[in-house]
Amino acid sequence: MAAENEASQESALGAYSPVDYMSITSFPRLPEDEPAPAAPLRGRKDEDAFLGDPDTDPDSFLKSARLQRLPSSSSEMGSQDGSPLRETRKDPFSAAAAECSCRQDGLTVIVTACLTFATGVTVALVMQIYFGDPQIFQQGAVVTDASCCTALGMEVLSKQGSSVDAAVAAALCLGIVAPHSSGLGGGGVMLVHDIRRNESHLIDFRESAPGALREEALQRSWDTKPGLLVGVPGMVKGLYEAHQLYGRLPWSQVLAFAAAVAQDGFNVTHDLAHALAEQLPPNASDRFLETFLPLGHPPLPGSLLRRPDLAEVLDILGISGPAAFYNGGNLTLEMVAEVQHAGGVMTEEDFSNYSALTEKPVCGVYRGHLVLSPPPPHTGPALISALNILEGFNLTSLVSREQALHWVAETLKIALALASRLGDPVYDSTISESMDDMLSKVEAANFRGHISDSQAAPAPLLPVYELDGAPTAAQVLVMGPDDFIVAMVSSLNRPFGSGLLTPSGILLNSQMLDFSWPNRTANHSAPSLENSVQPGKRPLSFLLPTVVRPAEGLCGTYLALGANGAARGLSGLTQVLLNVLTLNRNLSDSLARGRLHPDLQSNVLQVDSEFTEEEIEFLEARGHHVEKVDVLSWVHGSRRTNNFIIGVKDPRSLDATGASIL
């Protein structure tokens, strides 16, 4: 029976006693201990004799466990062989505590090192995210006036070009595909915004007056000598300056994208076909007609048109940069000769003296958003003034659209009158003071107090000077994966500019028409002294590339907007911003809704074809003289909300497209 008990205990406990298991699992040998020869295992019967009956109480068992010599932690293993167990003078648990303390110190060092390393890696990754170059091709959008130019901008982004690279290529493309609106012989303005750094730069490459141009010459002969209308082109200098600041791909490669469009040919757009059929310049030369009407009649939309002459010019500029355009080379000589032959006074020195300006945009806060727009001689301050005035009205979804339209019409009358007082601040110091007043919320509240809720003003609140601007303009909007926003508007002034075409294929602008002089218009409106003609001066401009971002932080709505139509464009931008930022409409709906524009010279409120008869009747009941027209302006846009980016064209345009990378 005793043998059976012993066998059952051994099968239950195995080869080791509970004390042996404790010594193996709880107290490993310290690394510095010398290994000792393994001691032979005692017989189970001898241990049981010492421990006594296994059914004894736990306290007795634990006491006996403390008397067990722990072979795995002893340095005198050899002396224990064959010896009976004896009480130890040293508590093995005290030794274990010391050993654990030693191991905890080592663990602390390891954990500290790991945390330090992890923190360093995290900081490096955060810095890379915010300040490093993008590592993958993410979302983006491009919007232009022609589908092939939008596709070209997208292609540049796909080849890891910057947002500005894409904008430059697309703008040059529009100079080929939309020669009635833009080109190398014109000028414009580009607004670039860095989202991560919250920094903005405006590159002004508006045309300037030749040094020998005088107001008297324009008064006598502006309508018979088209050479007098040509300003020094700024397009090449401006795009090159933008690329120097923000470009990623080589300049020559960016220009090669556009040169391929000119060389391979493009499909004539609806807008170009209409311009060639209805808006040919009266002085169109044989060279002009051979270039744009090669078959002797206006081309149909979709017809293939090639411009190998412009492809060659772009190749030259890609190799030599703007020097080939401005520093007395063959291109410069051709432009000067063409202008002088048509009665103009431009010289080679005018080209060498020209420079693009890099400056800060004007800005205002509207409904928690920062609105950025070009400073004078552009009319960005008047746009912000309109928003400041409207901000004080209770414009919500609860207010009827008809009432909101009345407030907008009266507000735009004030804003456009303010715009007519602007000009080039380099030549008139009072313009800076006028700009400050336009940006003031206090002044806006004062103007708002003069607006009746129920009746249109019978006469303008402010003196109105001559307002005439480029009716045609080309737009490029880019939001790229590099977290940059680019908005650009360029122009030749009226369709095909001056109509003067150089042997190299450069179509020259007519921007001197944007200056003000006596008896300039049929209605004999008063000329603006601030916008009078002076050598080297830049005329008043309604080219208004506009960027919107959250006033605080990074999260929220970002917008890039552009418009054509001169003063009508300012009215259109105001209403689109109102729809998006105040009425919380999506961008597509905001661009599609009907728009109005007050013509200050005739005191007529123009509305587009989207207006209903009920809306027109409401406005007429308030005292507005309403005239319905098909289209007032095109406003294109791109919107970014968090990480979602979309590009949207104005639905009134048959040719413009917006493309997005999803």
Swiss-Prot record:
It catalyses: an N-terminal (5-L-glutamyl)-[peptide] + an alpha-amino acid = 5-L-glutamyl amino acid + an N-terminal L-alpha-aminoacyl-[peptide]; glutathione + H2O = L-cysteinylglycine + L-glutamate; an S-substituted glutathione + H2O = an S-substituted L-cysteinylglycine + L-glutamate. The chain crosses the membrane at residues 107-127. The modification Phosphoserine is found at S17, S72, S79, S83. It comes from Rattus norvegicus (Rat). Glycans are attached at N198, N267, N283, N330, N353, N394, N519, N523, N586. GO terms for molecular function: glutathione hydrolase activity; leukotriene C4 gamma-glutamyl transferase activity. It holds the Pfam family G_glu_transpept. InterPro entries: GGT_lsub_C, GGT_peptidase, GGT_ssub, Ntn_hydrolases_N. Heterodimer composed of the light and heavy chains. The active site is located in the light chain. GO terms for cellular component: plasma membrane. Residues 128-662 are extracellular. Hydrolyzes and transfers gamma-glutamyl moieties from glutathione and other gamma-glutamyl compounds to acceptors. Pathway: Sulfur metabolism; glutathione metabolism. Residues 1-106 are cytoplasmic. It is a single-pass type II membrane protein. Coiled coil: none annotated. Residues 26-90 are annotated as: Disordered. It comes from the Eukaryota. This is Glutathione hydrolase 7. It is found in: Membrane. Keywords: Acyltransferase, Glutathione biosynthesis, Glycoprotein, Hydrolase, Membrane, Phosphoprotein, Signal-anchor, Transferase, Transmembrane, Transmembrane helix, Zymogen. Gene3D superfamilies: 1.10.246.130, 3.60.20.40. Its main location: membrane. The keyword Phosphoprotein applies. Residues 72-83 have a biased composition (Low complexity).
